[in-house]
Amino acid sequence: MEIRRLTYADLPQVIAIERRAFPTPWSLAMFVLELSKASGICLAAFVDDELAGYMICSRYDTVWHIMNIAVDPDRRRHGIASTLLVRLFERVDDPDAQYTLEVRRSNTSAIALYDRFRFRGAGVRRRYYADNGEDALIMWRTPGTLRGTLDDVPGT
């Protein structure tokens, strides 16, 4: 597996995966906007020279917000999302970094993945997903969650 910076040239493949992976996919304009931000980290995972997954992460003040992470449905359960997360943490390279994300409450496999990386649930965004009104679980990974506490998680 090769992990590299996501580029505009990757977007046709990104959109194809996005449409297969999510009931309410991001638009091309949303990806273009995120790629244009100098403060973000956007990663692509390639397997056999084909895009297999990607991650969009933006920095807001002192918090890294994982906005989108997706793996081609045919390539799931092969460690691609885990590798993307590891590479994000390596690139940020700050033991005091805080990360947050939203995930569908029904997406138990994604929640289990984030839990393995010491993200912890710390709130809910009611009716966050437009397609069915499902709530989003807000998860955080902070120095505190790495120690087993929520003492430095905003809002807890």
Model-derived regions: residue spans:
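Conserved GNAT acetyl-CoA-binding A-motif
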Residues: V92-E102, R125
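Conserved short alpha-helix immediately C-terminal to the canonical SAM/SAH-binding motif I
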Residues: L84, N107-A110
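Acetyl-CoA-dependent GNAT
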Residues: E2-H78, S82-D94, P143-L146, D152-T156
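A secondary-structure capping/hinge motif
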Residues: G121-G123
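Short, P/G- and charge-enriched loop/turn segments at secondary-structure junctions
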Residues: M30, R125-R126
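Short glycine/serine/threonine/alanine-rich loop segments
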Residues: I80, A97, F119
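C-terminal "cap" of GNAT-fold acetyltransferases
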Residues: R104-T108, F117, R127-T156
